[in-house]
Amino acid sequence: MQRPFKSLSRSLRQPFNRLYAQRRLREYHSQKRTLDEVVDWAMNFGGGGYMAVKTLQIPGEITRLAQAVQAIKPKIIVEIGTARGGTLLIWSYLASKRVIACDLNDMHRQRPLFSQFPPPESHCQVTLLSGNSHEADFKARLARELNGEKADFMFIDGDHTESGVEADYNDYKEFVRPGGLIAFHDIVEKQPLPTNQVFHFWKRLKVGADVQEFVADPGQCGFGIGLLRVPEA
């Protein structure tokens, strides 16, 4: 009986969670924000249930990445691994035209919230794609959404196994323009879970490449961001 009761409890709380999220979003949009403020909101937006906005990031690391992305004045951003939408809030602030957010989980409940992330003065549109990034059909859906355009920045934060992150990189790097940026999360060697294996792929990928690493503490467990600049054509 615990599972049905838990599901019922969540359903009963959902209207209140939605109202809270809408109030927080109005507060967020009540004034123009600096990038530092947007990162702070991404870390502390809060909420409950499906309407909770969270990000598992170290503030200093994600801020440095966001600054690097801001410097290239991105029009289009693609994110693989949206989860609770915290980083999506940041990308929606930075992209001038479009953010395509991809996640394994169904995001239809979050759509009314996530689609309103861009600032009121922005022309950015948010598209949510739910599905398995390792499936050919999903790649075809993303290709149709881009319709021949290239992303300026791609954030890969989905499958954390070595083979999974390598597959995401190899399958989707073609959608990033020459000179664009691709970032990976959880690149440090010491990780809390054995399935967090991004370090092993990143160690191979960065050899001879134009990369930056944003790591708050070399001895930390988990986190760390690797940034790769795509070679110019």
Where are these regions (language model features)?
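Membrane-proximal basic amphipathic "stem/tether" segments
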Residues: 1-47
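S-adenosylmethionine/decaboxylated-SAM
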Residues: 51-56, 60-233
